[in-house]
């Protein structure tokens, strides 16, 4: 159960990787490599001979990194697919028993190579793929949007009751909001995914929040990261006030739901 998703760093056989080349640069290269590589095309030149489009061969270290990176992304994509399917089944099961859905929406994403490299640098981690897979657990992410606060915790309970889902970490920003007013339930889980060569435990971050929490978080993110504008302390205070208003609306809706036995 302690097995982790690992991608082994392979020493290039043709030449040593330049020490000044950062993981960020290499990951971005690997991420873009397949899109940039032209496909072979065949045309008749009138003489019956075939012309094949040629391109410069990639260095051995680039090919090796691209292969490892693609394999790593396959693991995380599979983890997202499997976890999403579980959530959809639990949502349908709950609907059959309660005549309503506890999940409003499910979204997923995989961090870009640039975002991964920035996070590793911020954490002071060695820029290697093996270190990445053993220390960064939010490369694959799922966001679950629920109507009510109680739905958030019920869906989390149902998910964690699955025997092939292991809880790694929980951060409850609903009961203990961040200073800026952010509210959400964050889970890091490992899910068993079976491949042709065996089973792997894939880490996935699951963010669970209400519709109101998601509205505030999404809008606040757009405002905060407007690059050509400066967010003043007064604006931060207003954003925090909006978060508190949304939280109060959540609790009022929850009380109404309980009063009418929803």
Protein language model regions, located:
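An acidic, glycine-/histidine-flanked metal-binding catalytic module
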Residues: 45-80, 87-93, 204-262
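Terminal, regulation- and interaction-focused segments at domain boundaries
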Residues: 139-146
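Glycine-rich, low-complexity intrinsically disordered segments
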Residues: 73-75, 102-108, 132-133, 145
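Generic alpha-helical secondary structure
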Residues: 72, 76, 80, 113, ...
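Short, flexible, solvent-exposed loop/turn segments with mixed acidic/basic and small polar residues
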Residues: 127-137
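Eukaryotic low-complexity, non-globular regulatory regions
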Residues: 2-70
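Surface-exposed, low-hydrophobicity interaction/linker segments
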Residues: 79-80, 84, 88-125
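Long beta-strand-rich cores associated with HINT superfamily self-processing modules
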Residues: 133, 146-253
């Amino acid at each position: 159960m302690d097995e982790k998703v690992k991608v082994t760093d392979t020493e290039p056989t043709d030449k040593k990787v330049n020490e000044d080349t950062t993981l960020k640069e290499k990951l971005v290269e690997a991420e873009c490599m397949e899109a940039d590589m032209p496909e072979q095309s065949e045309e008749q030149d009138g003489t019956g001979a075939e012309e094949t489009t040629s391109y410069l061969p990639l260095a051995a270290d680039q090919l090796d990194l691209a292969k490892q990176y693609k394999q790593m992304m396959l693991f995380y994509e599979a983890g997202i697919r499997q976890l999403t399917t579980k959530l959809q089944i639990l949502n349908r099961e709950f609907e059959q028993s309660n005549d309503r859905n506890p999940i409003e929406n499910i979204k997923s994403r995989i961090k870009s190579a640039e975002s991964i490299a920035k996070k590793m640098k911020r954490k002071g981690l060695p820029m290697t793929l093996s270190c990445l897979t053993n220390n960064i657990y939010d490369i694959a992410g799922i966001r679950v949007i629920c109507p009510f606060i109680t739905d958030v915790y019920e869906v989390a309970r149902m998910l964690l009751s699955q025997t092939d889902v292991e809880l790694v970490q929980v951060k409850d920003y609903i009961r203990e909001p961040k200073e800026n007013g952010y509210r959400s339930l964050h889970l890091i889980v490992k899910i068993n995914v079976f491949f042709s060569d065996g089973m792997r435990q894939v880490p996935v971050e699951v963010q669970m929040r209400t519709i109101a929490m998601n509205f505030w978080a999404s809008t606040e993110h757009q405002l905060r990261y407007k690059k050509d504008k400066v967010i003043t302390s007064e604006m931060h205070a207003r954003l925090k006030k909006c978060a508190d208003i949304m939280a109060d609306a959540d609790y009022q809706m929850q009380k109404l739901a309980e009063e009418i036995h929803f």
